[in-house]
A protein has these predicted regions:
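Membrane-proximal, proline-rich intrinsically disordered regions
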Residues: 1-53, 81
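Structured, solvent-exposed acidic/aromatic patches
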Residues: 55-224, 230
């Protein structure tokens, strides 16, 4: 595909956001045989550790994540695949759309939080605010800093999309690329607020006042209606 093809019909932004969406659960074939990361990042890691999944035929001599003999190769998979394939696409999408494509920018922000909150819940401190910052040498943020950043990202996304809906009623430039919500910007706002509620519940013990504030903020938005697919 040429640069000219990419610039037509929002392809440059839409294709990138499609990769990010599939990168949430790593069910995207990145080429070179990279169509199996979901097994490592989810099945052999969180699913086994939590007891959600068990292997009928013992692997690794019957000693691995199922009995808390944690396997470095399995446990590092989410980190490696996120920072090698998904976060670079997020970073490029933010930079490419920030000033020119507000709707795509807002959706990128929401997807960024959706992708990375799973990563910080796996590992704790993660590289977030200093990603691609060579001077900071990819300094990791604490989990508290990351969660605070998540809430700010969602603030930005909801504000940008809300304004865009008012200024461009009925717009759906992203529809043909959107495998989650069919390019419906109202649904993306609902998703952002339901995601805010989920994150608020995650910090309810560690930071109850912050959790209460964020949960109430989500509920206060007129776009949030829970019995929808968002």
């Amino acid at each position: 595909m040429t640069d000219e093809n990419l610039q037509a019909d929002y392809n440059e932004h839409g294709i990138r956001l499609g990769i990010i969406q599939q990168g949430i659960y790593f069910n995207y074939d990145y080429g070179k045989g990279k169509n199996w990361p979901f097994q490592l990042t989810q099945n052999l890691n969180a699913d086994m550790f939590s007891g959600y999944m068990h292997d009928a035929k013992p692997l690794n001599g019957g000693s691995h994540n199922l009995d808390y003999n944690l396997q470095d190769g399995w446990n590092s998979a989410m980190w490696g695949h996120t920072y090698e394939y998904v976060f670079p696409q997020i970073y490029q999408s933010e930079n490419a759309t920030r000033d020119r494509m507000p709707a795509f920018f807002g959706i990128t922000k929401i997807l960024k939080v959706e992708v990375m909150h799973r990563v910080t819940d796996y590992y704790g401190p993660i590289v977030y605010s200093h990603f691609a910052d060579l001077e900071a040498r990819y300094m990791p943020d604490t989990q508290k800093e990351v969660y605070n950043a998540f809430f700010c990202e969602l603030d930005t996304a909801v504000a940008v999309l809300s304004d865009y809906i008012v200024e461009h009623p009925g717009a759906s430039e992203f529809a043909r690329f959107d495998m989650l919500l069919d390019g419906d910007y109202d649904s993306w706002i609902k998703f952002a607020n339901s995601l805010r509620m989920r994150l608020a519940m995650r910090i309810a013990v560690a930071s109850p006042e912050k959790a209460k504030t964020e949960f109430r903020k989500a509920v206060s938005y007129t776009h949030l209606t829970l019995p929808t697919k968002a």
